[in-house]
C-alpha cells in the first residue's frame, strides 16, 4: 500500500530530494532578533522626540510670562502717566489717555487710592498700586534724574546733586582699589607659595594698600617668619617694587633653611686667607649671599696699597714712580725690603755730555773713565756680595738679573742698577738726595735710564793686596795709544765716582757683542764642614775682578739685594720670595764687606794723600779666593812696610819674576798661574811675583801688570781654585802679561774679549788664592795713594 504526501501541507515531512539544513533556522532566528532590537530602538527614539516636543511647547509659556511682566511694567508706567495727568489738572487728557491705553476705570474713582481690581475678558490687566505724591511720582523722579545727569555730564546741577555725585565717585574708586589689591595679594601669595616661603599668612588687601601708601597702621599679617621685617616696607617678592638699593641679607634661620653669612675678610696683601664672596664649602640654597658692604682700596698694616681686586704677594711692595713704558717691570721678589734709597741723578743727552767733557778738561777726561763692578756668579751655590758702607746703616745685597740669553742692549751692562761699590774715605752719597722712586722701581728700569751726571768730587780709596794679572783681547802687537776713547755703541756713565756692581747670570754675547764674565771654577759645598786652618781655609772659590766691556750706569749703594746664582738653570735667586733660582736653600752671609774711612772733604783728602783702606771679606763657608782689580795709574804700597815709595822704570830694568817650583809650573797644566815661557816679561808691561813685592819697599807701577803665585797661610796651594791668565781673541796663546785695555778687561778662564777700543793706562791686579782664615782678614792689605774710586774700573767676582 503506498501513501502519497501532499506538498501543500507544511507539516508534512519533506521529501528526501530536499535535504534539511540547520543553518537556515539559525539565520531566521538572528533576523527575528535584529528586528526586535530595531523596534525597541525606534520606540526609544520616538519617546525622545516626544519629550523634545514637549520641551519646545513649554518654552513659549516661559516667554509669555516675560512678556506679561513687560506688559505689566508698561502698564505700570501708563498708570504713573495717568496719575501725573490727573494731578496736573489734565482730566480730559487723562480720560483720553486711559481710553487709548485700555485703562477702563470707573468714572469718579480716584486711582490714587490704589488700583481697582475688575474682572475682564483678558484685555484688561490689574493695576498696581501707584505711589501717592503731591505732584506725581513721575515728576519727582524726573527732577532727580535730570539733576544728576547734568552733574555727571558737567552741565551744572544743584549743590545736593554734586555732593551726591562725589560720594558715588569715591565709593566707586575705593571699590576699584580694593578689587585691584585683592588681585595683587593673590599674586603675591601665589609667588610665595611657589618659592616655598608661604606660611599661611592672611594678607588684607586694605592693609597692604596702607603700607604702600605709607600710612601708619598695624601689621597686615602676624609675624610668623623670622626673616620678615616688622617695618612696613614693600614685600620682597613684589615684581613691581623689588628693586633694592642694597643686596638682601638673610639671617641664619634653621627653620627657614637660610644659610649663615660669613663676615667679609679685611683687605690685605696676602690673599691666602681670603675666600670668595660666597662660601662654596656650604650648599647655599635660596637667595644669594652677599658680603656687604664692599670696602674700597685701603692700606695694609705695613703700608701696602691693596684692594680686593689685586693680588700682592709681598709685604713691602710699592709701585714704581714714573716707570718707563719700554722697560720690563721688576719682579716683586727682587725689590729690597726697608732699604733707604738715594735719588736718581738727572740724565742728560749725549750732546750735553760732550760739552761738559770739553769744559772739564784733562781732569774731567780722566775721571770720565767708566767705573763698573761686575759680579759674575759662575759656581754652584755661590752667593753675590753684600756691600756695606760705614756711612749707611743698612747692608744691601746685590741685585740679581733674571735674563738668561740675548738680553736687550739696555739691560746688558746695566741689568740691575740698584747696586754700587764705594772706594773712598767718606760716604759720597751723604750729600746726595734720596729718591723715593728708587725704592720700588725695577733695577732694570733704573739701569736703562740715561747716563747720570758727572761727580765733581773725588775720593781716595784703597783695596786689599792681591797678585796682579793683565790680559788683552788684542794680540801682542797691538799699538798703544795715549788717547782715551770709550767703546762704541755704549753709553757713558755721568756719575764717574760711583762704580756699580752688576750681577751676570750667563756668559753669552748679545747683539752688541757685550762680554760677560764667567767662571769655570767649581765652588765647594756650602753645607759641608767648615774649613780648617790646615786644609784649604780660603773663604770662597776663584773670583775674577776684571773689567767689563760696556760702561755701567752708576747707581746708589743703598738699593742692593743679596742673591744666589744657579749655573744649571742660568738664573739668579733673590733673598725674598719665589725667585728665579733653583736652589732656594742657600743663605750665605755677605761675601763682600767694603769699609771706608770717616766722611770728609774729598778734595782735601785727595790733596793730603791719606791712604784709604778697603777690606774685602768673604762669606762663611768659602775656601778660596781669586780676585782681579783693574787699576789706573796709582801708587801701590804694601801694608807690610811703610817705606818711601820708589818708582820703577817703565822698561829695561825689571824685576825677575819669581815662580815657585811646583806642579803648577808645567806648561801642560791648564790651571797653572805661570809657565816657564811666561816667566820673562815682554813689552813695556812688566811682570812681578807678588811674593817678591810682599816685603819690598813701596813701588810705583805707572803702567805695569803683576802676577802672583800666592799660597795659603799654611803653604797649601789650591791649584783647583786658581785661574790662569785670560785668553785673548787673537792668535796668541795664553799670556801672563799683555798690554792693558781701555777698560782693563780681565776675563775668566776660557773667555775672549771683543772690545775694539782700549786704553793703555789701566792696570790689572790679580789677587789669586788669597790666604784667608775664617773670621779673619786677608794676608795682604793694599794701601793706595793718589787714587780714588775712578781708578777702579771693574770688579769681577767669580764664584
Curated annotation (Swiss-Prot):
Classification via InterPro entries: LisH
Low complexity bias (residue ranges): 41-55, 307-317, 341-353
A biological-process GO annotation: positive regulation of cell adhesion involved in single-species biofilm formation
Species assigned in the record: Saccharomyces cerevisiae (strain ATCC 204508 / S288c) (Baker's yeast)
Record-annotated LisH domain positions: 73-105
Alphabetized UniProt keyword annotations: Activator, Nucleus, Transcription, Transcription regulation
Family: Belongs to the FLO8 family.
Protein name: Transcriptional activator FLO8
Top-level taxon in the UniProt lineage: Eukaryota
Composition skew (Basic residues), residue ranges: 354-370, 482-497
Annotated region described as Disordered, given as residue ranges: 1-20, 37-68, 101-127, 255-406, 431-503, 568-622, 644-691, 705-758
One GO cellular component term: cytoplasm
